[in-house]
């Protein structure tokens, strides 16, 4: 038995893959661990609607009933959004969840893994995980970065989550040979903010150019994925200095309460939401919608290439 035996792809998605039509993978951690019910369910429907509106097929991923699900029906989306007993699954957790039949929400790393197994090359998310602040002492580095180094999926995101050490995250990606491509920008975005103070490797002018870059990477046999950095729309951007103050307060709270490991990111995002009066969640929604839109356009262009 191989890992592909655990794969369960919705018929509509499988048909699109077989016919070479554009498909965009979506994660489920943002649903189960990123926002409350029923707002998360509305968000899930909105994202899928945006993907379809751009001419692609949405493929939300999860682990349910011992299966790697690619495409969720209404009942399965409800399960992920109500999040009763739903765990957060990274690569290390996959075998446990498959063996025990537990329900798990997919992180960036796990979504990349599942998408690759299904033959999906394009994935939209909010922001990737990376090297945490203080990682020189804690060694807290997201598995997302190793997945980007080895799994052939392009991840469209609003940069790295601003709670991270963005400079070290970019250094790690460079070491692992992962290209960081900006969507019509020279600046690497910091999730809620359009600029982080760091630069992308390449500024691509449009979806067609990005599609050609990633296809060429895989055509010539280079391993791994690509990080496509798509800044949050200007009207939803939050002030960088204000966000740094908020993030530092949330980090202090996490340290005081002994929060670490996989609990760190959900804790920080929840407290940042509270400290910004909900403003950060509104920005999070809009950047995720924008990433889904751009990812769909890249997927459409990718499927046109010979």
Kindly give the residue locations of the regions a language model identified:
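General beta-strand structural signal in soluble alpha/beta enzymes
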Residues: 24-26, 58-63, 104, 122-127, ...
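Solvent-exposed alpha-helices and their adjacent loops that cap or buttress functional pockets
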Residues: 15-18, 23-24, 114-117, 122-124, ...
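A C-terminal functional module that forms or caps the active site or interfaces directly
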Residues: 224-290
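Active-site glycine-rich loop that binds ribose-phosphate moieties when present
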Residues: 105-107, 136-149, 153-174, 207-212
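Anionic-ligand binding region
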Residues: 194-219
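Glycine-rich nucleotide/cofactor/substrate-binding loop typically near the N-terminus or early
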Residues: 28, 33-35, 41-98, 219-234
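Divalent-metal (Mg2+/Mn2+/Ca2+)-assisted nucleotide/phosphate chemistry catalytic cores
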Residues: 73-152
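N- or domain-start disorder-to-order transition segments that initiate the globular core
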Residues: 1-20
């Amino acid at each position: 038995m191989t890992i592909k035996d655990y794969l369960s792809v919705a018929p509509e998605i499988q048909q699109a893959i077989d016919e070479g039509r554009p498909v965009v993978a979506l994660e489920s951690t943002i649903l189960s661990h990123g926002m409350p019910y029923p707002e998360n369910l509305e968000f899930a429907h909105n994202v899928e609607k945006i993907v379809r509106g751009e001419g692609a097929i949405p493929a939300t991923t999860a682990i349910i009933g011992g299966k790697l699900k690619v495409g969720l029906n209404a009942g399965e989306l409800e399960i992920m959004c109500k999040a009763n007993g739903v765990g957060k699954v990274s690569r290390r957790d996959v075998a446990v969840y498959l063996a025990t039949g537990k329900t798990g929400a997919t992180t960036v790393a796990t979504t990349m893994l599942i998408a690759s197994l299904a033959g999906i090359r394009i994935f939209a998310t909010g922001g990737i995980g990376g090297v945490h602040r203080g990682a020189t002492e804690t060694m807290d580095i997201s598995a997302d970065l190793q997945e980007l180094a080895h799994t052939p999926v392009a991840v469209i995101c609003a940069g790295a989550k601003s709670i991270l050490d963005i400079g070290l995250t970019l250094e790690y990606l460079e070491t692992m040979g992962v290209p960081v491509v900006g969507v019509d920008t020279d600046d690497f975005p910091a999730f809620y903010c359009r600029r982080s103070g760091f630069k992308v490797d390449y500024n691509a002018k449009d979806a067609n150019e990005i599609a050609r870059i990633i296809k060429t990477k895989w055509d010539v046999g280079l391993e791994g994925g690509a990080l496509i950095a798509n800044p949050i729309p200007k009207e939803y951007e939050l002030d960088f200095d204000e966000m740094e103050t908020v993030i530092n307060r949330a980090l202090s709270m996490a340290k005081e309460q002994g929060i670490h490991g996989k609990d760190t990111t959900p804790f920080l995002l929840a407290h940042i939401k509270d400290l910004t009066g909900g403003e950060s969640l509104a920005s999070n929604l809009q950047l995720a919608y924008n990433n889904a839109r751009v990812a769909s356009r890249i997927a459409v262009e990718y499927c046109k290439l010979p």
